[in-house]
Amino acid sequence: MATGTDQVVGLGLVALSLIIFTYYTAWVILLPFIDSQHVIHKYFLPRAYAIAIPLAAGHLLLLFVGIFITYVMLKNQNDTKKTQ
């Protein structure tokens, strides 16, 4: 069973994910249909970032996954050399 702290952290992460999803959905799907002079446009970044930010996040994710896999493989290789 999860502790109270775990539940609060989990709820916070879910809430943050929902906020980001709602913001990104409004930014990418709804904003192009709203007049460019409308006041709501000042709350969103330029549209070029709608592609650049997820692309950069994807690259960073792949980089960290690759580094982690490399680290684990090298560590396991060193452990097997020590036991032999």
From Swiss-Prot:
Molecular function via GO: enzyme regulator activity
InterPro entries assigned to the protein according to its UniProt record, in alphabetical order: DPM2
An individual GO BP term: GPI anchor biosynthetic process
Major subcellular site: endoplasmic reticulum
Membrane topology listed for this record: Multi-pass membrane protein
Pathway connected to this protein: Protein modification; protein glycosylation
Pfam families: DPM2 (PF07297)
Residues annotated as transmembrane: 11-31, 49-69
Keyword Transport: no
Compartments in which it is found: Endoplasmic reticulum membrane
Gene Ontology annotations for the cellular component aspect, listed alphabetically: dolichol-phosphate-mannose synthase complex; glycosylphosphatidylinositol-N-acetylglucosaminyltransferase (GPI-GnT) complex
Keywords attached to this entry: Endoplasmic reticulum, Membrane, Transmembrane, Transmembrane helix
Disulfide bond entries: none
Complexes and interactors: Component of the dolichol-phosphate mannose (DPM) synthase complex composed of DPM1, DPM2 and DPM3; in the complex interacts directly with DPM3. Component of the glycosylphosphatidylinositol-N-acetylglucosaminyltransferase (GPI-GnT) complex composed at least by PIGA, PIGC, PIGH, PIGP, PIGQ, PIGY and DPM2. Interacts with PIGA, PIGC and PIGQ.
Function: Regulates the biosynthesis of dolichol phosphate-mannose. Regulatory subunit of the dolichol-phosphate mannose (DPM) synthase complex; essential for the ER localization and stable expression of DPM1. Part of the glycosylphosphatidylinositol-N-acetylglucosaminyltransferase (GPI-GnT) complex that catalyzes the transfer of N-acetylglucosamine from UDP-N-acetylglucosamine to phosphatidylinositol and participates in the first step of GPI biosynthesis. May act by regulating the GPI-GNT complex.
Family per similarity comment: Belongs to the DPM2 family.
UniProt-recorded name of the protein: Dolichol phosphate-mannose biosynthesis regulatory protein
Origin species: Bos taurus (Bovine)
Taxonomic lineage: Eukaryota, Metazoa, Chordata, Craniata, Vertebrata
